[in-house]
Amino acid sequence: MAKLYFYYASMNAGKSTNLLQADFNYRERGMATMLWTAALDDRGGERAIESRIGLGADAHRFDAGTDLWQRISAAHAVQPLSCVLVDEAQFLRRDQVWQLARVADAAGIPVLCYGLRTDFQGELFEGSAALLGIADSLIELKAVCHCGRKATMNLRVDDSGAAVRAGRQTEIGGNDRYVALCRRHFSEAMGQ
């Protein structure tokens, strides 16, 4: 039976790298995969998914209006898929997570989702909350805080490096905008 997996972590834990390695493992064995990432995250440029260590791959892009069940099942009818991999899964809508569960349950295709658990204020993203609720398997990937502890929080910083305490939930950026911290150092930086 195929499953819905959620690999979650803070920034800089290697989520995209893990996704690209899993994709390579399937393709190396001659199996077809389908990669997805959020349309609003354009940091990869030409390559829709790109890791900090330089690996990258083309991917389909989803937005709030994408019917993932329809798009994936249509592709599967043309060429059987062995796996669907979704990067930036925190940006999925709740109904899209249920569509991915249907891909696993009805089409029998494993779905591997990778994303952040929480935003810069420690709040769950809609997609992450839905995945934490219904995924068959939850796998935490580890990042490291500057103190050596496990980093579980994402601190947003401004141009001078000061903690940002308010703002939109979604602001695309990498190491220049976010710092992965343990809860203790996140709390200190946020003045809590």
UniProtKB/Swiss-Prot annotation:
One of its GO terms (molecular function) is ATP binding. It catalyses: thymidine + ATP = dTMP + ADP + H(+). HAMAP family: Thymidine_kinase. Gene3D superfamilies: 3.30.60.20, P-loop containing nucleotide triphosphate hydrolases. Belongs to the thymidine kinase family. The gene is tdk. InterPro entries: P-loop_NTPase, Thymidine_kinase, Thymidine_kinase_CS. It is found in: Cytoplasm. Pfam families: TK (PF00265). Keywords: ATP-binding, Cytoplasm, DNA synthesis, Kinase, Metal-binding, Nucleotide-binding, Transferase, Zinc. The keyword Kinase applies. It comes from the Bacteria. Homotetramer. Zn(2+) binds at C145, C147, C182, H185. This is Thymidine kinase. GO terms for cellular component: cytosol. GO terms for biological process: DNA biosynthetic process; thymidine metabolic process. Its EC number is 2.7.1.21. The active site is at E88. ATP binds at A9, S10, M11, N12, A13, G14, K15, S16, D87, E88, A89, Q90.
